[in-house]
C-alpha cells in the first residue's frame, strides 16, 4: 500500500518535529516535483543553500538550466542601472546602426535580396557587420580563446555573437559575388588567393591586445570627396571622432586600416608607395600643411589589409580634439606619378561593406575607475514595502536555521549565477557575449575548516575564537578567492565598436575569509 507508506513517513517527520527539544529534527521528506515547482525557486541560481528560501516567484522561467523569475519593470530598470555602472557607462548606448535579431535563413535571404536594391552602397544588410565590427569580433574571439586556455569551465565561457560564427575560419561563406568575410589583416603573399592568416598573427598586435584594457574602432566620417589642388587632386581624406574617449584612458597604439584588392590591367606590374599624412592646418587658397605618419610599399598583385601606425597623432587628438583635422592618403608609382587610390586597388567608403577603411586604437587605463555613488532611496522604499510580507517567512526560516545541524547547512562553495544581457533588452548594442556566468559564493564557514574551503590562516584563527566567544566574534565569511575578467564587445552612441576588459567579474573559486 504505497499510500500508507507515504503517510507513515510524514508521521515520523512530525513526531521528530515535536521532539525537537531533545535534538535536531530529521530531514523533511522530499516534496513531489509538482509541489517543489509550486514552492518556487531562487533567482538566477542553482538552488543555493538548503534551509534558505526565496519569495515564490510570480512567473518562474527556465533558461540554460537556471530557474529564475521574470523581473518587474522597476527591478529591471534598477538592475540595468547597476550593471551599466559596473561597465563604466553613464547611460545605455543607442547606436544609429545597431544589431537586429537573427532570422531564419530562408526569410533572411529573401529580405536581403529585396533590400539589396534599396541599400546605399557600402551599407551591410540587416544583421550583418561592417569591416570594423568584424575585426573587433576577431579580437574578441582571440580574448575568449585565451580565457578558455586559462582553464575556464564550459559554464564560464562567454558566448559568441550569434550572427557570426566563433572564429573567422568558421564564419559562414558569403553568397557568390559577395565580399569575403574579414579573416586577415596583413598583406597576403603574391598569388596566395583568398586565404590568409588570422588578423592576430603578428606578435605586435598580440602584445597590443594583451596590454590594453580597451580597444575601440572608429568609422570614417567623410561622406563626400573634398576638392584638392591639382598637385593633390588624387589625395583621399579620412576623419575620425575621438572626442568620446572615457576619462583616464591613454592611447597605447593606434592604426589606420584600409583594404587593397589585387590590381589588374595597365597597373598589374606596378609598385605603389602609399603614404598617410596628418593634417596639421587647413588653408583656403593653398594646400593643407601635412605631416608624414607612415608609408607602405606594395605590389599590384598583393591583396589584404594595410596597416598604418598613427599612434602619435591619436594621442594628440585625444588630448586636444581641436587639432583633429583628419588624415590624408596619397599613392605614388615607382615612376613618381601620383595616381588615384582606386588605381592601386585601395577600397574606399563606396566599396563592399566588409572592406570599409577604419581606425582602431588600443587604450590602457591610467587611473582606477571609481563607480559613481547613486541614491538607493528607491531600493529602500521597495525593501520597506516587502519587509512586512517577508517578516513571517524570515521568522519561519530562522526557526529552522537555529538548529546547529550539519544536515541543514552546506559548506562554503561556488554557486551558479548567470547574467543575461539579452534578458535585459541589450541585444541591439552588445555584440558579444549574450551573457556570462558571474557565479557567487555562499555557505557556512564552520569548524573544522576543511582544505576544500580554501580558508586563510586568519579565518582559521577567527573560527577558533568564535567557538570560545560566539557572541563577540562572528564566523568567517564565504567570499571569492579567485576572480576572472570578461570581455564585452558593444556599440557606442556613434556606432563605434568598443572591446573592453572588465576585471574581477567571474567567480572561479570560493573560500572562507
From Swiss-Prot:
<keyword id="KW-0964">Secreted</keyword>
<dbReference type="GO" id="GO:0060348">
    <property type="term" value="P:bone development"/>
</dbReference>
<dbReference type="GO" id="GO:0001938">
    <property type="term" value="P:positive regulation of endothelial cell proliferation"/>
</dbReference>
<feature type="signal peptide">
    <location>
        <begin position="1"/>
        <end position="20"/>
    </location>
</feature>
<dbReference type="GO" id="GO:1903392">
    <property type="term" value="P:negative regulation of adherens junction organization"/>
</dbReference>
<feature type="region of interest" description="Disordered">
    <location>
        <begin position="38"/>
        <end position="66"/>
    </location>
</feature>
<dbReference type="GO" id="GO:0071260">
    <property type="term" value="P:cellular response to mechanical stimulus"/>
</dbReference>
<feature type="region of interest" description="Disordered">
    <location>
        <begin position="89"/>
        <end position="131"/>
    </location>
</feature>
<comment type="function">
    <text>Growth factor of the TGF-beta superfamily that plays essential roles in many developmental processes including cartilage and bone formation. Also plays an important role in the regulation of HAMP/hepcidin expression and iron metabolism by acting as a ligand for hemojuvelin/HJV. Also acts to promote expression of HAMP, potentially via the interaction with its receptor BMPR1A/ALK3. Initiates the canonical BMP signaling cascade by associating with type I receptor ACVR1 and type II receptor ACVR2B.</text>
</comment>
<dbReference type="GO" id="GO:0050679">
    <property type="term" value="P:positive regulation of epithelial cell proliferation"/>
</dbReference>
<dbReference type="GO" id="GO:0001649">
    <property type="term" value="P:osteoblast differentiation"/>
</dbReference>
<dbReference type="GO" id="GO:0014823">
    <property type="term" value="P:response to activity"/>
</dbReference>
<protein>
    <recommendedName>
        <fullName>Bone morphogenetic protein 6</fullName>
    </recommendedName>
</protein>
<dbReference type="GO" id="GO:0031982">
    <property type="term" value="C:vesicle"/>
</dbReference>
<dbReference type="GO" id="GO:0005615">
    <property type="term" value="C:extracellular space"/>
</dbReference>
<dbReference type="Pfam" id="PF00688">
    <property type="entry name" value="TGFb_propeptide"/>
</dbReference>
<dbReference type="GO" id="GO:0008083">
    <property type="term" value="F:growth factor activity"/>
</dbReference>
<dbReference type="GO" id="GO:2000860">
    <property type="term" value="P:positive regulation of aldosterone secretion"/>
</dbReference>
<keyword id="KW-0221">Differentiation</keyword>
<dbReference type="GO" id="GO:0030509">
    <property type="term" value="P:BMP signaling pathway"/>
</dbReference>
<dbReference type="GO" id="GO:0030539">
    <property type="term" value="P:male genitalia development"/>
</dbReference>
<keyword id="KW-0891">Chondrogenesis</keyword>
<dbReference type="GO" id="GO:0000122">
    <property type="term" value="P:negative regulation of transcription by RNA polymerase II"/>
</dbReference>
<keyword id="KW-0325">Glycoprotein</keyword>
<keyword id="KW-0225">Disease variant</keyword>
<feature type="glycosylation site" description="N-linked (GlcNAc...) asparagine">
    <location>
        <position position="404"/>
    </location>
</feature>
<dbReference type="GO" id="GO:0032332">
    <property type="term" value="P:positive regulation of chondrocyte differentiation"/>
</dbReference>
<feature type="glycosylation site" description="N-linked (GlcNAc...) asparagine">
    <location>
        <position position="241"/>
    </location>
</feature>
<feature type="compositionally biased region" description="Low complexity">
    <location>
        <begin position="98"/>
        <end position="121"/>
    </location>
</feature>
<dbReference type="GO" id="GO:0001822">
    <property type="term" value="P:kidney development"/>
</dbReference>
<dbReference type="GO" id="GO:2000048">
    <property type="term" value="P:negative regulation of cell-cell adhesion mediated by cadherin"/>
</dbReference>
<dbReference type="GO" id="GO:0030182">
    <property type="term" value="P:neuron differentiation"/>
</dbReference>
<dbReference type="InterPro" id="IPR001839">
    <property type="entry name" value="TGF-b_C"/>
</dbReference>
<dbReference type="GO" id="GO:0032026">
    <property type="term" value="P:response to magnesium ion"/>
</dbReference>
<dbReference type="GO" id="GO:0006954">
    <property type="term" value="P:inflammatory response"/>
</dbReference>
<dbReference type="GO" id="GO:0003323">
    <property type="term" value="P:type B pancreatic cell development"/>
</dbReference>
<feature type="region of interest" description="Disordered">
    <location>
        <begin position="373"/>
        <end position="398"/>
    </location>
</feature>
<dbReference type="InterPro" id="IPR017948">
    <property type="entry name" value="TGFb_CS"/>
</dbReference>
<dbReference type="GO" id="GO:0150005">
    <property type="term" value="C:enzyme activator complex"/>
</dbReference>
<keyword id="KW-0202">Cytokine</keyword>
<dbReference type="GO" id="GO:0001654">
    <property type="term" value="P:eye development"/>
</dbReference>
<dbReference type="GO" id="GO:0051216">
    <property type="term" value="P:cartilage development"/>
</dbReference>
Amino acid at each position: 500500500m504505497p499510500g500508507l507508506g507515504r503517510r507513515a513517513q510524514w508521521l515520523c517527520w512530525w513526531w521528530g518535529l515535536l521532539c525537537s527539544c531533545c535534538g535536531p529534527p530529521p530531514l523533511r521528506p522530499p516534496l513531489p516535483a509538482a509541489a517543489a515547482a509550486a514552492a518556487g525557486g531562487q533567482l538566477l541560481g542553482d538552488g543555493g543553500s538548503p534551509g534558505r528560501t526565496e519569495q515564490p516567484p510570480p512567473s518562474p522561467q527556465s533558461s540554460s538550466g537556471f530557474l529564475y523569475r521574470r523581473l518587474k519593470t522597476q527591478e529591471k530598470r534598477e538592475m540595468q542601472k547597476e550593471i551599466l555602472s559596473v561597465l563604466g557607462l553613464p547611460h545605455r548606448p543607442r547606436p544609429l546602426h545597431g544589431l537586429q535579431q537573427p532570422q531564419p535563413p530562408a526569410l533572411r535571404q529573401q529580405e536581403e535580396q529585396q533590400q539589396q536594391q534599396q541599400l546605399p552602397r557600402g551599407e551591410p544588410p540587416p544583421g550583418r557587420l561592417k569591416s570594423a565590427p568584424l575585426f573587433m569580433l576577431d579580437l574578441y574571439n582571440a580574448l575568449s580563446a585565451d580565457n578558455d586556455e586559462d582553464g575556464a569551465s564550459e559554464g564560464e565561457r562567454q558566448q559568441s555573437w550569434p550572427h557570426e560564427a566563433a572564429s573567422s575560419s568558421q564564419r559562414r561563406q558569403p553568397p557568390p559575388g559577395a565580399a569575403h568575410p574579414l579573416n586577415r589583416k596583413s598583406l597576403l603573399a603574391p598569388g596566395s588567393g583568398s586565404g590568409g592568416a588570422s588578423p592576430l598573427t603578428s606578435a605586435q598586435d598580440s602584445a597590443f591586445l594583451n596590454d590594453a584594457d580597451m580597444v575601440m574602432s572608429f568609422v570614417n566620417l567623410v561622406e563626400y570627396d573634398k576638392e584638392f589642388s591639382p598637385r593633390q587632386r588624387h589625395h583621399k581624406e579620412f576623419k575620425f571622432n575621438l572626442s568620446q574617449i572615457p576619462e583616464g584612458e591613454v592611447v597605447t597604439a593606434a592604426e589606420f586600416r584600409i583594404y587593397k584588392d589585387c590590381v589588374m590591367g595597365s597597373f598589374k606590374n606596378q609598385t605603389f608607395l602609399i603614404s598617410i599624412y596628418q593634417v596639421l592646418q587647413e588653408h583656403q587658397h593653398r594646400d593643407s600643411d601635412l605631416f608624414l605618419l607612415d608609408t607602405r610599399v606594395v605590389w599590384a598583385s598583393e591583396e589584404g589589409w594595410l596597416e598604418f601606425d598613427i599612434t602619435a597623432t591619436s594621442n594628440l587628438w585625444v588630448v586636444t580634439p581641436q587639432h583633429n583635422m583628419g588624415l590624408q592618403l596619397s599613392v605614388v608609382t615607382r615612376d613618381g606619378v601620383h595616381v588615384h587610390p582606386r588605381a592601386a586597388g585601395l577600397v574606399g567608403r563606396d566599396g563592399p561593406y566588409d572592406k570599409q577603411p577604419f581606425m582602431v586604437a588600443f587604450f590602457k587605463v591610467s587611473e582606477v575607475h571609481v563607480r559613481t555613488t547613486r541614491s538607493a532611496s528607491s531600493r529602500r522604499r521597495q525593501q520597506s514595502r516587502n519587509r512586512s510580507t517577508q517578516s513571517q517567512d524570515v521568522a519561519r526560516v530562522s526557526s529552522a536555521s537555529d538548529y546547529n545541524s550539519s544536515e541543514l547547512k552546506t559548506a562554503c562553495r561556488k554557486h551558479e549565477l548567470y547574467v543575461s544581457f539579452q534578458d535585459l533588452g541589450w541585444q541591439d548594442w552588445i555584440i558579444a557575449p549574450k551573457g556570462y556566468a558571474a557565479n557567487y559564493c555562499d555557505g557556512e564557514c564552520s569548524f573544522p575548516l576543511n582544505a576544500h574551503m580554501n580558508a586563510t590562516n586568519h579565518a582559521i584563527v577567527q573560527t577558533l575564537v568564535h567557538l570560545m566567544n560566539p557572541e563577540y566574534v562572528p564566523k568567517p565569511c564565504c567570499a571569492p578567492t579567485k576572480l576572472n575578467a570578461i570581455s564585452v564587445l558593444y556599440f557606442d552612441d556613434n556606432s563605434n565598436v568598443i572591446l573592453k576588459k572588465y576585471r574581477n567579474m567571474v567567480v572561479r573559486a570560493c573560500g572562507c575569509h
